[in-house]
Amino acid sequence: MFWADKIAADAQGYQVVNDSKTPSGRVHVGSLRGVVIHDVIYRALKHAGKPVKFTYGVDDYDALDTVPKYLDREKFKPYLGFPLCNVPSPGEGAPDYAKYFINEFFEIFEYLGIQPETYFLRDLYRSGKLNSHINIFLKTTHLVRQVYKQVSKADRPENWYPFQVICENCGKIATTVVTDYNGSEVFYTCQPNSTNYVQGCGHSGWLSPLNGNGKLPWKVEWVAKWDVLGVTIEMAGKDHSQKGGSRDVANAICRQVLEKQPPFHSPYEFILVNGTKMSSSKGVGSSAREIANLLPPELLRFLMLRTQPRTVINFAPNYETITRLFRDYDTLISKYEVNPELTEELMSLFYAQLGDEVKVFQPFDYSTLISLLQIPRLNIQDEVVQRSANSLTKYDQFIVNQRIASAERWLEDYADEEEKLVLYLEQVPEKAHGLTSEQVTYIQKLAENLESATPWEPEVLQTIIFSTTKELNIPPADAFKALYLGFINKEKGPKAGGLFSYLEKSFVISRLQEITALYL
């Protein structure tokens, strides 16, 4: 059984699936994994006929703790330590920093067919919806301290309280420390040295903790959100889910302070881009927007779903990785077309769709599109029509156009020079002047064998290319190296049969003869 369907099968009663994000900067693609995982759990519950709601929170009362490298540091440095919702917007179209970055993320939700009910922490605090929980946790601070010590070995002092005030003098929230509570107000100090990235102003005083004047620390806040929203399912990343980590602390607070069961939880792994874990505030890795611009929505969902949640996804948008992603997706589409029964293998395909059905199409190989786009004077739409086994439906054409746009974007933004195909149409490339006698003999024989190639199609040409290596007993690697050097001046390239099929037969044979003539 697919992992999300198992969660749905075990769930009893009304379910609230929740996820959240701190909009500290441009949201990276790694954050999409949690979003898609929660969306799929929500869909699995709906698929199982169970009552369910999907909520997504914006943790915009968290402090700005770093100025991302892509923003003007001098402009935003004065706002370090401020709640994100109180920091100016980096651009037009949003009233503040938090909404500026989360709006872009929500656009990607829509692109991926994800439609949760969204909420902002500023609204929960300012409206008073968290007031009762603030009072509860301030009155049971000794229990909260006890949990921190038992679960995470964090020893809080006797005058520590689980609350941070927004300083009335300087507006920072990261620098304030609450050291007393009289039942209605907290006493706080905006300490100069409470963080390593910004100084507090030194102001102190008594203030009501209610109605948006401050926030709970996020492990405690997490528990308050669960209770207020009625959350029954919330997964968390591996970093939060380690023994003694933030999820263990939150679970224990939920049980020992509120005396309630925490939501169902199972950890999920990171997405690495080129082996690097991504960070929104540090700007490390590819942003969710960049990857959404590269991949069609179903393929981006499929990237998140083709591996188990507890398995790391290492996504390097190089030629091998991206062409394999499309190829794996097309394989499942073809299997579904033959037998439209939703087996466990096909559930990742089903949940990759934007709706509740799998729309089959005639797959056109993505790697072939990448090659075709690099052939001079070639009409790619005509080539697709000619190379397709059947006439294209409107939906087939839609998918092809989507993939052409993706391949163009990949070539422009992600392909390195070794992955690009530069055909030498006017003359024999320089590196083809250094072939071995064995390679030259192969080139000469291949020119003869290709004269009879009919039809001039990839499979036929690839067969002749291979059979000629056997005929002359030359290692295939040496033979292919000679071909690539003779046409693209590189030692490696796309399938030679496919490459030749894009070119005129007369040109290919003529080029092979030109190479041979260099050694006569």
Regions from the PLM with identified roles:
Residues 114-118, 122-267, 272-288:
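Active-site cores that bind ATP or allylic diphosphates and position pyrophosphate for catalysis
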Residues 1-72, 223-242:
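N-terminal catalytic cores of NTP/NDP-binding nucleotidyl/phosphoryl-transfer enzymes
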Residues 75-108, 112:
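A glycine-rich helix N-cap at a beta->alpha junction
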Residues 61-78, 133-134, 277, 283:
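Charged, often glycine-rich, active-site loop that binds/positions anionic groups
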